Amino acid sequence: MLDKPCGSAACPQCFRLHRLRKLAELAPLRGCMSAYRVVTLVYYDAMLEEEQISCWDHKKFRERVYKMVKRAGFTDKIVGGYELDFHTDIQRWMPHLHLLMPREPGALKTLRKAMKRDKNIRARAGIISRPMKSQKLRDFDAQVTYCFKGMWQEVRPYPDEVGKRRTRKHRLPPVLLARALCKQDEMGFTGLTFTSGVRTRK
């Protein structure tokens, strides 16, 4: 590791420091873990073709997510990270977020309803889409750092022993990895972090 960090969001060492910094910032929440959920939001209707990642308007997408969260009625802080995984079966990048969200039942229900609108649910023909996943916060360190893991991956589908569709994640191939790292470097740590109800760290 270099004596002086380069500060790039495409650098594994610098991203690790970013994750540790976020973990330290959120440490006060350890005492109220039951008041939070770890939520994944998948925006199927915002899929990108392979070459579109370089011109993806992440600021416009962030504003969309921010407005959706605000309309849901959350009152406490929300923080997490953006990711784009490449799905081999449809040859598309899939924007999604892993978020630490307050356990506010009414707001979570409203958000789930918004995420399950037809436009998002029916974006992939013949595939059952699950746009929102909510989990209890049980392992603080592991789940919080997962929200800022910063490793975009390739997702490959496969049938299980009863023929049900499953997926497995793999390292991106060289060309896609290069595109992903260039985008992460462009976005920076601030651009890769979603916040609502909390001051953004520059």
Predicted features by range, described:
Residues M1-W93, R103-K202:
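Right-hand nucleic-acid polymerase module
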